[in-house]
Amino acid sequence: MRKESFDEIKPWENNILLWVKQRKTISETIDAQREAFRDALNSIVIQKGWTVWIDEAKYLSQMLGLKEELTYCVEQLRSIDSTVICGAQRPAFLPPSVLAGSTHVFLWKTTDRRDQEKLSDIGGIDASIVRNEAKSLGKHEFIYIKSRGTTSHTTISQTPK
């Protein structure tokens, strides 16, 4: 097995970070973000073969009003050799297919009832176990769930106390 450190990994040349500059008002900024992200997602669907990282899927879905586009990407992009990775601080406000259609899910501690209820959208697992474990996680612990394939797996990280 080859070991690599961060200073040995070569930079990738084909990365794109979409960052919309602040406008005069919040409303103008949100409008500009909505247009830029909608155009980017449409281009990704046409071009195929992308890996898309959406850092705050709740913001994209709710604030920018792109729930339909996010749902489409999560449900359809794998059929065109593309991957969607969604990050979110609050699972309660994600479209249902974001969790239900995920192959890999990483969860950190949550005690919010709405977030815990949303975890039942993860396919192929016992939601009550995940909800209970998610409440009791320590500061640096997380739950990893592989929800696709012939069987589902749930792993809880262990950190030294």
Description of each model-found segment:
Residues 9-32:
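Conserved P-loop NTPase mechanochemical-coupling segment
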Residues 30-127:
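Conserved P-loop NTPase motor cores
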Residues 72-74, 104-106, 116-161:
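P-loop NTPase motor core of the ASCE superfamily
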Residues 1-11:
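Walker A/P-loop NTP-binding active-site region of P-loop NTPases
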Residues 9-14, 43-48, 136-138:
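Flexible, charged surface loops at secondary-structure boundaries
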Residues 14-17, 50-52, 142:
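Hydrophobic beta-strand segments of well-ordered beta-sheets in folded domains
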Residues 22, 111-112, 148-149:
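A broadly conserved detector of short glycine/acidic/proline-rich loop/turn motifs that flank catalytic sites
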